[in-house]
Amino acid sequence: MSVPYWRLSGFYFFYFATLGGFLPYWSLYLKNGGFDPIEIGELSALLVGTRIIAPNLWGLIADHTGKSLRIIRIASFFAAFLFTGFLFAENYFWFAWITIGFSFFWNAVLPQFEAVTLFHLKNEPHRYSRIRLWGSVGFIVTVLGIGRLLDSQPVAILPVVIAALLILSWWITLIIPEADDVISYGPASFGMMKIIKKPEVLAFFTVNILLQISHAPYYVFYSIYLKHYHYSATITGLLWALGVFAEIVLFVYMKGLLRRCTLRAILLVSLLLATGRWLIIGWCADYLGLLILAQILHAATFGGAHVAAIHLVHLYFGQQHQGKGQALYSSLSFGLGGMLGSLYSGYYWELMGSKFVYSMAAVSCGIAFVIAYIWVDRENAQNTAALG
């Protein structure tokens, strides 16, 4: 069976197009709704916090049944259905419960789809970045489109746009075929805990938790931060889009990069550049040129680090535990890390100021760099051969 390149790419396009409505503008929508920074941080923490449980639960079911794509379809449907509740919610209580319900299903989707994509690619995992880049294209389309839209329309229109994108994400899952070699392994998890207990794997997860803690102030407050410095919604959208465009360029050349560089090297460089990026954003907001440079660094801080992580999980956990491995990566990094980062940035944004919050993000990346340098992938310097 040939790889359904455009259908896989289409899912990434619509999934990350949805994210392009969330990340830059959801905090603005909440602020417009009367929520303060602490409440915005808490709601953002709930949004990512369900990743701690949801991906692992769905990953366990997927590996047990061998029906990853069916789970993706069910979760995508309920995510779209529950999100429509935001069209009617009016207070913190309802926003919190709808956020939990919607995100429990939405956060289940991507880790399973990563596994489905890699199963389709079989012995060609280096092609992953060429498929994944369409997610970045989708993100850019919506972040620019919504930015222009919000210069002329109230931000209250945002939930309608996101709901439509969620429906499209669900629709495209219906036309994607199962991979030929996706099979059920039954309830046994032989070797799973043995893998997790390896010092290198524990260090890998710790590094990614710290990396996502550092990203939280950017995801939650960057647009509010730019608005405070009097940047328009269009400029804000362009800056977000620039970061993802840089990510696309990296994805285009990632196949060659994976053949020339170890995953360890890609991860270490990404962490080092992330440290500098958060310092630039925190201390140089008045200088548009430096903000542009910081956004270009998104290619490494998210794109490079994520591709390295996806491939390391693939190598660590093997075929039998792919669903659970990708889910564990998602839940610990984007879930636990994102939740902790959202909470700390929300509580300290007004108390200590934006410079302090972004400086602590840089410290988090610095610690992650040291851990990765000491423990991650030191004994497997030739892993590029498996990827090229």
Which stretches of residues belong to each language-model region?
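Interfacial helix-cap and linker-helix signal at transmembrane-aqueous boundaries
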Residues: 30-31, 61-62, 133, 148-151, ...
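Structural signature of the two symmetry-related core transmembrane helices
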Residues: 70-84, 265-280, 362
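Helix-to-loop junctions at the C-terminal end of transmembrane segments
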Residues: 53-67, 150-151, 249-263, 349-350
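Cytoplasmic helix-loop-helix junction between adjacent transmembrane helices
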Residues: 100-134
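Symmetry-related core transmembrane helices of the 12-TM Major Facilitator Superfamily/SLC fold
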Residues: 157-174, 356-374
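Helix-loop boundary and gating motifs at the non-cytosolic
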Residues: 2-48, 201-239
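Juxtamembrane intracellular "pre-TM" segments in multi-pass secondary transporters
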Residues: 1-2, 175-208
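Hydrophobic core of transmembrane alpha-helices in multi-pass small-molecule transporters
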Residues: 13, 82-83, 92-110, 209, ...
